[in-house]
């Protein structure tokens, strides 16, 4: 069992215990120690530093207001060499085609740079993005298959790409 709680300001009091009670009510028991992502922030920071050493991430000072309705980041800060402190950290989305097969939704492909752009791994306020945390934790936990709702399907390409950058199988 993993509690994905990196976005601490959005956590409702008591939600963790409610989740665990629901799991138990359905007859499931954790087979290992419960992982709380909020306790692993240093690990995610280390991965960001690893990507920084490889020149695969950069600091970004653009705000949501500056980006407006454009959902694909144009790379405005990509070559500015801004300091990492108090900035968002983005991964460089290369011009690659990422494909996967979903058992229910079929084959999906995205041209990363054009359809997803450079996406955030860490917000300006220090909160680690879901994409990074789950990729690192899935790898460390040996998770190879993920069941997700159709509303989260568009996260898959980002996660595959991050796994490739980190040389995860």
Regions found by a protein language model. Give the residues of each.
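N-terminal Rossmann-like or analogous alpha/beta NTP/dinucleotide-binding catalytic cores
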Residues: 1-72, 151-168
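Active-site cores that bind ATP or allylic diphosphates and position pyrophosphate for catalysis
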Residues: 59, 64-169
């Amino acid at each position: 069992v993993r509690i994905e709680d990196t976005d601490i300001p959005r956590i409702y009091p008591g939600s963790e215990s409610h989740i665990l009670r629901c799991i138990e009510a359905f007859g499931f028991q954790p087979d290992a120690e419960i992982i709380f992502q909020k306790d692993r922030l240093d690990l995610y920071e280390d991965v960001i530093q690893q990507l920084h050493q490889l020149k695969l991430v950069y600091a970004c000072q653009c705000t949501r207001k500056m980006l407006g309705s454009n959902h694909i980041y144009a790379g405005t800060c990509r070559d500015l060499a801004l300091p990492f402190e108090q900035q968002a950290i983005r991964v460089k989305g290369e011009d690659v085609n990422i494909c996967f097969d979903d058992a229910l939704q079929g084959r999906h492909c995205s041209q990363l740079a054009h359809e997803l752009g450079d996406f955030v791994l860490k917000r300006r306020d220090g909160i680690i993005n879901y994409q990074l945390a789950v990729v690192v934790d899935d790898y460390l936990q040996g998770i190879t298959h993920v069941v997700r709702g159709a509303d989260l399907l568009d996260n898959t390409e980002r996660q595959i790409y991050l796994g490739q950058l980190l040389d995860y199988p």
